[in-house]
Amino acid sequence: MAPSTLTALAQEKTLNSKFVRDEDERPKIAYNKFSDEIPVISLAGIDDDSVDKRSQICRKIVEACEDWGIFQVVDHGIDIDLISEMTRLARQFFALPAEEKLRFDMTGGKKGGFIVSSHLQGEAVQDWREIVTYFSYPIQARDYSRWPDKPEGWRSITEMYSDELMALACKLLEVLSEAMGLEKEGLTKACVDMDQKVIVNYYPKCPQPNLTLGLKRHTDPGTITLLLQDQVGGLQATRDGGKTWITVQPVEGAFVVNLGDHGHYLSNGRFKNADHQAVVNSNSSRMSIATFQNPAPNATVYPLKIREGEKAVMEEPITFAEMYKRKMSRDIEMATLKKLAKEKVLQDQEVEKAKLQMTPKSADEIFA
């Protein structure tokens, strides 16, 4: 049976138990307590003939990738009208009646469409979000029957948007290729036939946002991700294993750029894979549009260049399909172990409770 949407659950006073996370996974800072630690980099002049201007921009990008694996770009050349239209139509889709959205339900392994929430196999707790997924590259593999046909015009706008974002991603990969001492197309070529999917995230208002996450902590498996977010706030990043978190300051018209595991491995660990999550709030719904650029399944994953004195961060070359499979297996195993540990604690508590109830009473208690 197709799931209901989060709209009804968002109206309740308490959070449904399937979204309640363990204390160690709950938000540590507020969705709107913004930090300016993530650099905002202007790309104005990156294509100019001025070597100095380009080198300055490239240096800032490289430093951000070495420091956080995440940064924001402005003056990126993407038409502001296209961005506005993509955002407007996405909001209209999520405002549709549940039955309209669920016509594109992608549960059961369907390639693209709408889905309510998300969680790993073996994990009980779900993320507080609704999603539309477009598999947009390779172009010849697009299945337009899985692309929502409402609101009118969204399909064609998404096509234009995905093309523009692919071009921007490749431009940023050129910068990182040069920084690694490779030819401009080094990282792009390593992806073979680059894959892309566009995921539109909708995070409804939440009755108890301190108990859940819109999207649990993770790193992206692919090469590079470009995220367009609204001004509400909720994207958070960490670089110390989750001990401390910052909320990324939303910047109007900017794209948040973060590197994934594939980009991390190709750079031999020089560039960080951004460790991030999304939190929700009880005041405003939030929307973001993430565009993931990934290598082809058969692309080789291994450092493209190993600097003198360094060791490879991988034992052997593997395909991206195998890398992704191992990542998912590890995540599922960790989720399963955590679930079993939680169940064991509850069982132990029940046993202790039963023992206390069976403890013989003293004579004073019996004759009281």
UniProtKB/Swiss-Prot annotation:
<keyword id="KW-0847">Vitamin C</keyword>
<comment type="similarity">
    <text>Belongs to the iron/ascorbate-dependent oxidoreductase family.</text>
</comment>
<dbReference type="GO" id="GO:0031418">
    <property type="term" value="F:L-ascorbic acid binding"/>
</dbReference>
<dbReference type="GO" id="GO:0045486">
    <property type="term" value="F:flavanone 3-dioxygenase activity"/>
</dbReference>
<keyword id="KW-0223">Dioxygenase</keyword>
<feature type="binding site">
    <location>
        <position position="218"/>
    </location>
    <ligand>
        <name>Fe cation</name>
    </ligand>
</feature>
<dbReference type="InterPro" id="IPR026992">
    <property type="entry name" value="DIOX_N"/>
</dbReference>
<feature type="binding site">
    <location>
        <position position="286"/>
    </location>
    <ligand>
        <name>2-oxoglutarate</name>
    </ligand>
</feature>
<keyword id="KW-0408">Iron</keyword>
<feature type="binding site">
    <location>
        <position position="276"/>
    </location>
    <ligand>
        <name>Fe cation</name>
    </ligand>
</feature>
<dbReference type="Pfam" id="PF14226">
    <property type="entry name" value="DIOX_N"/>
</dbReference>
<feature type="binding site">
    <location>
        <position position="220"/>
    </location>
    <ligand>
        <name>Fe cation</name>
    </ligand>
</feature>
<keyword id="KW-0479">Metal-binding</keyword>
<protein>
    <recommendedName>
        <fullName>Flavanone 3-dioxygenase</fullName>
        <ecNumber>1.14.11.9</ecNumber>
    </recommendedName>
</protein>
<dbReference type="GO" id="GO:0009813">
    <property type="term" value="P:flavonoid biosynthetic process"/>
</dbReference>
<dbReference type="Pfam" id="PF03171">
    <property type="entry name" value="2OG-FeII_Oxy"/>
</dbReference>
<dbReference type="InterPro" id="IPR027443">
    <property type="entry name" value="IPNS-like_sf"/>
</dbReference>
<feature type="domain" description="Fe2OG dioxygenase">
    <location>
        <begin position="191"/>
        <end position="295"/>
    </location>
</feature>
<dbReference type="InterPro" id="IPR044861">
    <property type="entry name" value="IPNS-like_FE2OG_OXY"/>
</dbReference>
<dbReference type="GO" id="GO:0046872">
    <property type="term" value="F:metal ion binding"/>
</dbReference>
<keyword id="KW-0560">Oxidoreductase</keyword>
<dbReference type="InterPro" id="IPR050295">
    <property type="entry name" value="Plant_2OG-oxidoreductases"/>
</dbReference>
<keyword id="KW-0284">Flavonoid biosynthesis</keyword>
<comment type="pathway">
    <text>Secondary metabolite biosynthesis; flavonoid biosynthesis.</text>
</comment>
<comment type="function">
    <text>Involved in the conversion of (2S)-naringenin to (+)-(2R/3R)-dihydrokaempferol.</text>
</comment>
<dbReference type="InterPro" id="IPR005123">
    <property type="entry name" value="Oxoglu/Fe-dep_dioxygenase_dom"/>
</dbReference>
